[in-house]
């Protein structure tokens, strides 16, 4: 049975490897000592679903609902960086400076009571056949926008990329899971939360009957080949269902097959004219996929049966995810007044670049240039071909960014804000 222990410092639930005598928290970096195995087994054997009414010692908590964080760290000192926009950031009218975010000095963990909090995940799968070129740029651009446009404190943004110096902040399955727990930890009315993921996505057969189309959507961490994928059911249970009244969460997921990756009850179907209707995705089993009173809005790269592009075509030089670039571009151009205007602008941008290239464009894979489909070759969620493999694919369906939510609403009336 999978065991979870609470961090002795910040109470973030941690996956406990079998036989471990101590574990390091990916969020606050504190070490938690583990009691001898018989004591752990005695707690685990009491019930397959332990509850808070059993009170193990702080160092041996078997995951109950998290308690408020005891952080006493002072907030970050002002950053020495000038926060120039990343190279791939939309609408940089002067020669952009290189990103200051890749090797920022480590600091104390983000406080859990900030009014604005974000987890940003960019997975490049470097030096593997799954490698993507735009995901680190996506992460840096998203961080820059949240800080400059929406006043997210840098100290309240948790970055997970392979470029982080600390391996505890690499985008592994365990670290991403812990970061999601941290994101919603002790949130309170008025909090605004953001979860951004740029990387590979996929789908697999649904095993519990909660999917309308019969498939679960998944996100692929950097270690997915050894640790497995993150399934939409897990994401929903971790950052959607616990969300209390007055808390708002925005998920921006740039990955293949990501349309309903948050497992939310309603999906907004919009055509090219901007007309829309809400599609009911509530499970026929009656399983609850909504929140505990909070609001969740999810912008995703494409529909569940589509793929998302990793391409230099939108920025003109730097590689980015098409959806992330279109999302930031729409906001920078003033189209983010309402959820409907933002979604419509994003879709128009992606449609425009696809129509312009008629599904075909010169792209680069592993150092070799050749013609293939813009949205069918370097796509998030598909494995790039070997360098010597000849590619001759038919054009894919146009990528169409999606919006889903925990409740249906008037998308052209509700103001968008992070």
UniProtKB/Swiss-Prot annotation:
Keywords: Hydrolase, Plant defense, Protease, Thiol protease. The gene is AMC2. GO terms for biological process: defense response; negative regulation of programmed cell death; proteolysis. Belongs to the peptidase C14B family. GO terms for molecular function: cysteine-type endopeptidase activity. Transmembrane segments: none annotated. This is Metacaspase-2. Disruption phenotype: No visible phenotype under normal growth conditions, but enhancement of hypersensitive cell death response upon infection with avirulent pathogen. Acts as a negative regulator of oxidative stress cell death and hypersensitive cell death response mediated by immune response. Acts via indirect or direct regulation of AMC1 at postranscriptional level. Residues 68-113, 385-406 are annotated as: Disordered. The active site is at 200, 256. Residues 103-112 have a biased composition (Pro residues). InterPro entries: Metacaspase, Pept_C14_caspase, Znf_LSD1. It holds the Pfam family zf-LSD1. It comes from Arabidopsis thaliana (Mouse-ear cress). The keyword Protease applies. Residues 70-80 have a biased composition (Low complexity). Residues 393-405 have a biased composition (Polar residues). It is an enzyme of class 3 (hydrolase). Its EC number is 3.4.22.-. It comes from the Eukaryota.
